[in-house]
């Protein structure tokens, strides 16, 4: 036994067991997130339950089965139910009934013993709406310009409404949004000239005429927008809900109409793919509990890229100074200790520092120096995407410094001496020999920085992230990239939907879907950086020997 321990074999097996447990845990977590997240997009079967309630009344419940659970019979002694006395538990179903304008909650529990009949009618319709969630029921009538039309016209009407909605969105965001932006810029220009005492009568008249012209364009676009909305609002669909009520739904509020129970496997697969595409390309709705997450995807990727651009040169330059130029003295040792300790500081502390120093001090000073015309409304003196990127750059700076130093220390000193002996300066040696060989280690530091920054939420809540951003940081208005704007983030979106949602049951699958998307983005960013690192490593492998 002693000989076996001395051979080192137990430690090899122990290490292998640790790696296996870690790998199984990671794969299990990914499987859990993927299975529950992807189920959010699969078209569910819509059931009709004929049942008897506690008062003995017959009623019908239409919806999709969201969850099942067993409860003790002892909790139901107050109900007059025909229950098998030998049973200890009873199954109950959580049904998503939708129709939020008719009932206060779009979920309800029903007991299996109360169900008298369960069917899957093929003519049940699921209507995905912009407000009030899904509607489940039967089509009674389709009205076009006040006249009833055949049900076969449904797809044609939906396509027409979709085209109108696209035109409305284009008018609102691109045309009307651009005019509003120019009017605001002109107002600030007038204010700036007033503060500088350079507003001449001629300049004031010119700016006034410019605003008048923009307002005239705005009126034309506003009339066109109203005309489009009138075209969209004239078509309606009359539905019959599960309680027999007739409900009129305007086509302008409809996103999609589907007969889930009629769909074949390939039909459901096609809808599954289309719903994933809509999830990653649409804006959120209904307090982030429905719709897509495109603004959050855009904000996450943009913030990570800005952070990478900031932290890469800072970390590499700091590592080069500490390893190549700084002497081995007490100050250098103190700096290394400080860098290592920074990696252990809680992320929320960085958020507080970013809010107090960058936002209030630096941003407030920038506003007073360069944006006085906007005061008291702050420009950079408020949380935004730039301060978020800088704060996370400081948070991940120790990772890049340590990784780069490790790469520099592995380069043989003979290569430095040989370069200097051939007449190269220290700067030329550093630029042409040292940095190319150390580039894989630099990329490793950047990979670790991206992985940590993409998942951080706590500091971002203080320095720039919001629940709903009205505008993206990147648009068609000069200067195109607006670093002062707030942004959405997938990590914060998960927290907001999971813990701040008014409808927890509806938001639960969305939490898993968003988490799966965040993991996918982080993996994609890391794999891109890893591929670059591997190419650099192969390119300079021969120089290391």
Regions found by a protein language model. Name each.
Residues 271-291, 350-394, 464-466, 473-481:
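Membrane-interfacial helix termini and adjacent extracytoplasmic/periplasmic loops
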Residues 287, 464-516:
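Interhelical loop and adjacent transmembrane-helix boundary motif
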Residues 307-339, 352, 529-538:
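Transmembrane-helix boundary motif in ABC transporter permease subunits
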Residues 313-318, 349-352, 387, 394-415, ...:
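Membrane-embedded alpha-helices of multi-pass transport/permease systems
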Residues 326, 405-413, 420, 447, ...:
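C-terminal transmembrane helix and the adjacent membrane-cytosol boundary/short C-terminal tail
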Residues 401-405, 411-412, 426-464:
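Transmembrane alpha-helices
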């Amino acid at each position: 036994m002693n000989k076996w321990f001395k051979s080192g074999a137990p430690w090899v097996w122990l290490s292998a067991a640790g790696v296996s447990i870690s790998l199984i845990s990671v794969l299990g977590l990914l499987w859990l997130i993927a299975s529950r997240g992807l189920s959010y997009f699969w078209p569910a079967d819509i059931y009709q339950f004929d049942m008897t309630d506690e008062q003995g009344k017959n009623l019908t419940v239409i919806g999709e089965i969201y969850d099942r659970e067993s409860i003790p019979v002892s909790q139901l002694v107050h109900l007059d139910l025909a229950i098998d006395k030998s049973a200890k538990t009873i199954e109950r179903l959580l049904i998503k009934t939708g129709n939020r304008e008719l009932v206060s909650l779009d979920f309800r529990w029903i007991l299996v013993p109360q169900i008298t009949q369960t069917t899957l009618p093929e003519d049940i319709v699921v209507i995905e709406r912009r407000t009030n969630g899904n509607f489940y029921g039967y089509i009674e009538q389709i009205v076009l310009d006040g006249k009833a039309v055949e049900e076969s016209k449904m797809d044609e009407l939906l396509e027409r409404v979709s085209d109108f909605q696209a035109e409305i969105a284009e008018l609102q965001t691109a045309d009307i949004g651009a005019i509003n932006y120019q009017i605001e810029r002109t107002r600030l220009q007038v204010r700036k000239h007033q503060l500088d005492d350079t507003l001449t009568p001629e300049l004031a008249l010119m700016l006034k005429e410019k605003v008048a012209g923009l307002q005239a364009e705005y009126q034309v676009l506003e009339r066109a927008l109203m005309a489009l909305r009138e075209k969209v609002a004239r078509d309606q669909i009359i539905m019959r809900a599960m309680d027999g009520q007739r409900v009129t739904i305007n086509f302008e509020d409809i996103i999609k109409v589907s007969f889930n129970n009629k769909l074949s496997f390939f039909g459901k697969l096609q809808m599954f793919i289309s719903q994933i595409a809509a999830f990653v390309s649409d804006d959120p709705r209904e307090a982030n509990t429905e719709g897509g997450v495109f603004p959050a995807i855009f904000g996450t990727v943009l913030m990570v890229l800005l952070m990478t651009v900031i932290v890469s040169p800072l970390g590499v330059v700091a590592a080069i100074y500490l390893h190549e130029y700084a002497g081995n003295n007490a100050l250098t040792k103190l700096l290394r200790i400080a860098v290592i300790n920074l990696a252990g500081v809680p992320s929320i502390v960085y958020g507080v520092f970013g809010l107090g120093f960058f936002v209030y001090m630096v941003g407030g000073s920038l506003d007073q120096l360069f944006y006085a015309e906007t005061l008291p409304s702050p420009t950079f003196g408020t949380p935004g995407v730039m301060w978020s990127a800088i704060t996370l750059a400081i948070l991940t700076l120790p990772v890049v410094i340590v990784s780069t130093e490790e790469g520099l220390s592995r380069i043989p000193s003979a290569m430095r001496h040989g370069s200097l002996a051939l007449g190269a300066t220290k700067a030329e040696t550093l630029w042409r020999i040292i940095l190319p060989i150390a580039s894989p280690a630099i990329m490793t530091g950047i990979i670790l920085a991206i992985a940590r920054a993409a998942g951080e939420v706590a500091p971002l809540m203080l320095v720039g992230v919001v629940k709903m951003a009205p505008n993206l940081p990147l648009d068609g208005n000069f200067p195109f990239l607006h670093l002062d704007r707030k942004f959405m983030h997938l990590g914060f979106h998960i927290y907001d939907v999971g813990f701040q949602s008014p409808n927890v049951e509806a938001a639960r699958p969305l939490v898993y879907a968003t988490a799966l998307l965040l993991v996918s983005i982080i993996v994609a960013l890391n794999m891109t950086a890893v591929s670059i690192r591997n190419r650099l490593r192969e390119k300079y492998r021969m120089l290391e020997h």
